[in-house]
Amino acid sequence: SFMAIRKASVLDMNFMNRIRDYISDGKIHTAVNLCKKTDTPIARMIEKGIERIGRPMSDVQTAIENVANLEVSKLENGLPFLATIAGGAPMIGFLGTVLGMVQTFMDMAAAGGTVDLSLLASGMYVAMVTTVGGLIVGIPAYFGYNYLVARIEKLVFQMEANSIAFMDILNQPVQK
């Protein structure tokens, strides 16, 4: 997911300028080829819009939005799993903590009136190790999840901006 988001975020700053120039020069096929060669979610979205040139503007806009939704869905593919790990790992660690403490109290009860510290150490060790384990897994997953969500939101903003720019290109008069 990280690699897909990273690849999707790369866009040539001149991409839309080149698309505008090709469309205004009537080089529709060249514009489509540029989109295919660029191979990013934004390029695929614009390619679908170019393929709809000549149809009503609402059809063009709908086609672009459909591709954008599909592309965002692909990018979000692994995020629910990562969110589950981020939320679940600390809870599993906490469960281990509770089980370790239960073990400690059971050992204390079994020992009767004399409590040896080494007897308590085993259960407390389990409690602390599982807590640490859950946090070691959960914290990076939490930060990773939020980082990827922020990257996707930035990409969605770029997709919206490029969609608007493309619709503006289609609304410009053709220069001869």
Tell where the protein language model's regions lie, with residue ranges:
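Hydrophobic alpha-helical membrane-embedded segments
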Residues: S1-K7
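Predominantly long cytosolic amphipathic alpha-helical stalk/bundle segments
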Residues: S9-L95, L99-A111, F143-K176
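Hydrophobic alpha-helical elements at and bordering transmembrane segments
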Residues: I64, L75, L120-M124, M128
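Generic detection of intrinsically disordered/low-complexity segments and helix-coil linkers/edges
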Residues: L99, L119, I136-I139
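Hydrophobic alpha-helical transmembrane segments of polytopic membrane proteins
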Residues: M124-F143
